[in-house]
Amino acid sequence: MKFKIFLAIFAMIFFTSCSSDKENSSNENTDNASLSQSENTDFTLKFLDGRKMYVKYHEQEFNFDDTAKAKLFVFFTSWCEPCKAEIPHLNNLNKKYQDRFEVIALFLEENKEQEILTFIEDEKMKFPVAIGENNFVFSKVLNISSIPTMVLFNAKGEKVKEYLGLIPEEMLDIDIQKAIM
């Protein structure tokens, strides 16, 4: 009986989300730690492939320079096991809806680019990855306090849904279908 209780507690902790302690220590290094959802800010997400995405946040509305697709922003770290477990599902969804939707991963770590590239290769990530201090800015604007956290936006930049912890692929699929309509 004790083993079953232990197993249930362990599973609940594992599948809910990772602690944000490591994230918070990294966030202390940014100049934008005081941002909140009430402030206006503009910033640029920088991707490993050289692409950039301009994000404007004014009066609690988001504007992305790329309005062709709905977006699922995935905030994660390399040490978070639930984050790693989601990657195959996110690859599937990114491929399934590639014409109208994209997954965008945001590393909340200050790793060297080569470490991130190795992680991407090891975990077989097949969607864009943003790196840099503006990932922390975006996480502060969205009030991200744990990982994994995913935030779904439609193509107009309207926030559709926020997810905490490990989310079933089927649930994401249904919400993505609504966001791309």
Regions found by a protein language model. Name each.
Residues 1-53, 181:
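N-terminal targeting signals for export/organelle localization
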Residues 44-71:
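A short beta-strand-turn-helix
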Residues 68-70, 99-102, 126-128, 155:
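Loop/turn elements at helix/coil->beta-strand transitions in domains of secreted/extracellular proteins
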Residues 69-71, 76-79, 146:
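Short pre-active-site segment immediately N-terminal to redox-active cysteine/selenocysteine motifs
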Residues 72-73, 103, 150:
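Hydrophobic beta-strand anchors of alpha/beta hydrolase catalytic cores
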Residues 80-84:
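Short, thiol/selenol-centered motifs that function as redox-active sites or metal-ligating centers
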Residues 85-123, 134-139:
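Structural microenvironment flanking redox-active thiols in thiol-disulfide oxidoreductases
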Residues 122-126, 133-177:
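Thiol/disulfide oxidoreductase modules built on the thioredoxin-like
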